[in-house]
A protein has these predicted regions:
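Hydrophobic/aromatic-rich core segments of domains that either
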Residues: 1, 9-19, 24-116
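Secondary-structure boundary elements
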Residues: 1-24, 259-287, 291-294
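Short Pro-Gly-centered beta-turn/loop motif in secreted/extracellular proteins
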Residues: 70, 173-194, 203-207, 286
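A short, amphipathic beta-strand motif
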Residues: 134-144, 223
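Short, ordered, surface-exposed loop/turn motifs in non-cytosolic proteins
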Residues: 142-162, 183-185
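Short, acidic Ser/Thr/Gly-rich low-complexity loop/linker segments typical of extracellular
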Residues: 159-180
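Structured interaction patches on ligand/partner-binding surfaces of diverse proteins
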Residues: 193-219
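Compositionally biased low-complexity segments at domain edges in trafficked proteins
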Residues: 214-273
Length: 294
């Protein structure tokens, strides 16, 4: 049903609501998964959006859907039908993820590791659903060697030519912070509460004890750092489907696409959109970036 309504297209950083997505028949992964979760929940099927903030082995990120079936969470693409659950284009990519999380409403009492708790939501760690994990741990110390309580610790992967924090934690009274991640290397950055003193280091996947980070004034940090970051090796989640199931799925996808194409055919053509934009004193090029149904 979701495939009949929506197909993939890139968009800007502001996520469309499910209604806007279905009106336009387009959505990027975050919008497709938001739409699919809304549809599943509307039918009484427990579902949640999961998200890897940044890949470790390639640029960009991804969001998809988990659905609760027979006492377990299973994954699927947002508007990407497959022959069975736990089959998607990202079976291999997800096995190389350093961090996958989900946001749930309220206080969470499930089995997953809690990353942070806000007023209305809890962020939980779902990485172990997709790849073996290990504990990435640090102890942050002040310049005098005492534990730095409340320091911010950013666990980062290299993506789009920057160190992007996939998770940020605060240290406890012992200066400790730790998170379960995939078996890859991380860049870790720590800073005190006033953000006046900082420290950074590389956390290798095979580190057997917490790394010690000693905070120093920002001006005293090294000018350069040589490093090598290795992402987790691929160990693709097995895709289990018979040839008959896959053939049946392909036929349904063709039918789904034909239904969506019929809806898209009702859209105003670009020429009409440009004329309307001029009439309403809008920028024509901007009007071409959005598709609006009748």
């Amino acid at each position: 049903w979701c495939r009949q309504k929506v197909t993939y297209a890139p968009s800007d950083g502001r996520t469309h609501s499910p209604l806007e997505t279905v009106y336009n028949a387009l959505g990027r992964c975050g919008e497709q998964s938001t739409f699919a979760v809304a549809a599943l929940r509307a039918m009484g099927i427990p579902a949640r959006q999961v998200y890897t903030p940044r890949w470790a082995h390639t640029d960009d990120n991804h969001a998809w859907v988990e659905v609760w079936v027979d006492g377990e969470w299973h994954f699927l693409g947002g508007s990407e039908p497959a022959a069975n659950l736990d089959i998607a284009w990202f079976n291999g990519a997800a096995s190389r993820a350093m961090f996958v999380h989900a946001k749930v409403f309220g206080r969470y009492e499930g089995n997953e590791e809690i990353i942070s708790t806000e007023r209305n939501t809890t962020t939980i760690n779902c990485t172990a659903h997709y790849t073996p994990t290990h504990k990435a741990e640090v102890v942050v110390k002040n310049a005098d060697g005492s534990p730095s309580e409340g320091a911010l610790v950013h666990f980062c992967v290299y993506n789009y030519a920057e160190f992007y924090p996939v998770a940020t934690l605060r240290t406890n009274g012992s200066g400790y912070a730790g998170i379960s991640t995939g078996h890859g290397d991380l860049f870790v950055w720590a800073e005190d509460e006033k953000r006046q003193e900082q420290a950074f280091d590389i956390l290798p996947a095979d580190l057997s004890k917490p790394a010690i980070l000693r905070l120093t004034p920002e001006g005293n940090l090294p000018d350069s750092l040589e490093f090598k970051l290795t992402p987790p090796h691929e160990n693709a989640i097995p895709a289990r489907a018979t040839e008959e199931e896959m053939a049946s799925c392909d036929k349904r996808i063709a039918m789904d696409d034909s239904i969506r194409h019929a809806y898209e055919a009702t859209f105003a053509p670009p020429v009409s959109a440009n004329e309307a934009a001029k009439k309403w004193e809008l920028t024509p090029t901007r009007s071409e970036e959005r598709r609006v149904g009748k």
